[in-house]
């Protein structure tokens, strides 16, 4: 699913459809800071969900973090393979 999601993100980056939240992140006036702020916000929400032991919210916020992380990778001209390689090196 990560590869599929990343392909959609790359498509939005290339085509910048007007009605796409993902595309709006690539054209945001704050640039990558908009994504970095979202990552911080979503991480805080994940911490709060974990403290509340709210499994549904933990899954939701984790997905938000993964999504925004993939957008950041695309902004930096990286991809899922870079992430996989780093994780493999840590085995």
Which residues does each predicted region cover?
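Flexible "arm" and connector segments at domain edges
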Residues: 1-62, 66-91
């Amino acid at each position: 699913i990560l590869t599929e999601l990343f392909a959609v993100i790359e498509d939005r980056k290339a085509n910048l459809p007007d009605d796409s939240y993902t595309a709006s992140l690539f054209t945001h006036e704050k640039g990558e800071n908009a994504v970095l702020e979202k990552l911080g916000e979503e991480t805080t929400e994940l911490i709060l969900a974990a403290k509340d032991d709210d499994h549904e919210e933990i899954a939701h916020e984790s997905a938000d973090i993964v999504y925004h992380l993939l957008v950041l990778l695309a902004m930096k001209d990286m991809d899922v393979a870079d992430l996989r390689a780093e994780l493999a090196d840590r085995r």
